[in-house]
Amino acid sequence: GVKEKLLAVLRKACPVIEKLAKKCHGTVATLKKACSLIH
C-alpha cells in the first residue's frame, strides 16, 4: 500500500537525513524523530 511505500522511502532517506541533521536543525530534527519511530 501507499503507507508501506512511504515507509520504504523514509528508510532509505534516513541516513541522508541524519547527515543533514548534523548541519541543520529544526525541520531535520523532526524528520529524524520520524525516522527513529520507523526503525
Swiss-Prot record:
It is found in: Secreted; Target cell membrane. SUPFAM superfamilies: Ectatomin subunits. GO terms for cellular component: extracellular region; membrane; other organism cell membrane. Keywords: Disulfide bond, Membrane, Secreted, Target cell membrane, Target membrane, Toxin. One of its GO terms (molecular function) is monoatomic ion channel activity. Belongs to the ectatomin family. Ectatomin-Et subfamily. This is U1-ectatotoxin-Et1b subunit A. It comes from Ectatomma tuberculatum (Selva ant).
